[in-house]
Amino acid sequence: MNPEYDYLFKLLLIGDSGVGKSCLLLRFADDTYTESYISTIGVDFKIRTIELDGKTVKLQIWDTAGQERFRTITSSYYRGAHGICVVYDVTDMDSFNNVKQWLQEIDRYATEGVNKLLVGNKSDMTDKKVVEYTVAKEFADSLGIPFLETSAKNASNVEQAFLTMARQIKERMGSSIATNNTKASVNVSPGHGVSNNSSGGCC
């Protein structure tokens, strides 16, 4: 019997509340966008299967709450993640400055050697941009991690961000991960987490 996929990768989206993590996930998984996405409580996830270098890759993408009060809940989701996207808002300098704190969370909770990607979201809001591309790029380069600016609103680089992460994980894992191993890691179906009513736009 042919397997449904060759690889199963668990990805995690982390970053301050309001930077657009949920919107990035919606754009990539469902190709939809909403101006007023309600804040995530705890975690939510979506699944999308892609073709990568002739292989079928199933991406299970977890969207975590950025609020401090949920930090203890979401920290457990770092374990077992193959790749982690650290997202900031290019119009919010604080969210960029807090990237270092999020990277420390990865070091504390995630599996050693986990793939990382820095994502500057809301790149369409050029008139409000405060974090310059060159500054973020130099920071990412100093850490040896890839960097992309994205816009969930106009879909710019969203696909590229997740494909970059998937390709990196695949290269790191090589051919050692067979379907039998990865299927055992987690077996879930697409679903929606519970959200609260604090609304806020994300681009």
From Swiss-Prot:
InterPro entries tied to this protein: P-loop_NTPase (IPR027417), Rab (IPR050227), Small_GTP-bd (IPR005225), Small_GTPase (IPR001806)
PROSITE patterns from the UniProt entry: RAB
Gene Ontology biological-process entries: autophagosome assembly; intracellular protein transport
This protein's UniProt keywords: Autophagy, Cytoplasm, Endoplasmic reticulum, Golgi apparatus, GTP-binding, Lipoprotein, Membrane, Nucleotide-binding, Prenylation, Protein transport, Transport
Molecular function GO labels: GTP binding; GTPase activity
Membrane topology note: Peripheral membrane protein; Lipid-anchor
Principal subcellular localisation of the protein: endoplasmic reticulum
Documented activity regulation: Rab activation is generally mediated by a guanine exchange factor (GEF), while inactivation through hydrolysis of bound GTP is catalyzed by a GTPase activating protein (GAP).
Transit peptide listed as a keyword: no
Motif Effector region: where in chain: 37-45
Location of region: Disordered: 180-203
PANTHER family: RAS-RELATED PROTEIN RAB (PTHR47977)
Biological role stated in the UniProt entry: The small GTPases Rab are key regulators of intracellular membrane trafficking, from the formation of transport vesicles to their fusion with membranes. Rabs cycle between an inactive GDP-bound form and an active GTP-bound form that is able to recruit to membranes different set of downstream effectors directly responsible for vesicle formation, movement, tethering and fusion. Ypt-1 regulates the trafficking of secretory vesicles from the endoplasmic reticulum (ER) to the Golgi.
Protein name (database record): GTP-binding protein ypt1
Lineage summary: Eukaryota, Fungi, Dikarya, Ascomycota, Pezizomycotina
Chain's gene name: ypt-1
